[in-house]
């Protein structure tokens, strides 16, 4: 590996999901002012984030799918004849 091109502050950081409280330890260069003591006894820099894969509806399976096919059919039934020439 080339020397001098990698960040000096690449270290383990705790990312805390504010919506459900989950915590993840990930290596990062993010600059933080807060720290947190984890269960392993070490103190890590803390970064609070609004949403993660632990709380995002796409990843948790709570995603709502909208049925747009009915709306398109209703639109075409109402206005589909307007664009056609007789």
Curated annotation (Swiss-Prot):
Q: Does the keyword Ribosomal protein apply?
A: yes
Gene3D superfamilies the UniProt entry points to? Ribosomal protein L31
Q: GO MF terms on file? A: structural constituent of ribosome
Q: List the disulfide bonds.
A: none
Q: Name one GO cellular component term.
A: ribosome
* Pfam families the UniProt entry points to: Ribosomal_L31
Tree of life domain: Bacteria
Keyword tags: Ribonucleoprotein, Ribosomal protein
Keyword Cytoplasm, does the record have it?
A: no
Q: Which GO terms describe its biological process?
A: translation
Per its UniProt record, what PANTHER family does this chain match?
A: 50S RIBOSOMAL PROTEIN L31, CHLOROPLASTIC (PTHR33280), LARGE RIBOSOMAL SUBUNIT PROTEIN BL31C (PTHR33280:SF1)
Tell me its family: Belongs to the bacterial ribosomal protein bL31 family. Type B subfamily.
Q: What quaternary arrangement does the UniProt entry report?
A: Part of the 50S ribosomal subunit.
- What HAMAP family does this protein map onto? Ribosomal_bL31_2
Q: Which NCBIfam families match?
A: L31, PRK01678.1
Report what the protein is called. Large ribosomal subunit protein bL31B
Q: Which organism is it from?
A: Chloroherpeton thalassium (strain ATCC 35110 / GB-78)
Q: Which gene encodes it?
A: rpmE2
